[in-house]
Amino acid sequence: GGIGKGYAVERAMQILQGAGIEHAVVNAGQSSIAAIGHPPDRAGWMVDLGVDGTGLGEIELGDSSISASRQGRVPMAPGDRGYGDIIDPARGRPVESTVTVIVRILSATQADALSTTLLVLPIEEGKRVLEGFPGAAAVWLSATGDVIAMHRDIRAPRWKR
């Protein structure tokens, strides 16, 4: 979470590219994924986002990164409802959101940081933040997988560098 997995994915991609590899996917547990190039028979890599029923269950990913953030609950005792692992810095308390945010952008580090940031912010404020990242797209999903909001089309298969 945060930016750690995104940074690790980005570094792995840099190492692969430095070794001359032009086509690859690095997947760090479904929530942080980056791709370069494409498989021989497609324009991009098919990536399952694990959000069935939204039309976003599987997208084509090429030369970009994707990150998903949602509030998990960590129980502290048997029968406890649990506490969230993402903290709202303005309140100093766990985020109460049941939303999942998925961000797509070239940099895996930025994707990871943005998806967590957008989970904390109100949607309209999050969209304003995204305006500072011209290549970024995002989707906010409800706990039942319904699309609440979208900023640009996250399904676009390729992103310009």
Which residue ranges define each predicted feature?
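Mature catalytic core of soluble alpha/beta enzymes
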Residues: 1-161
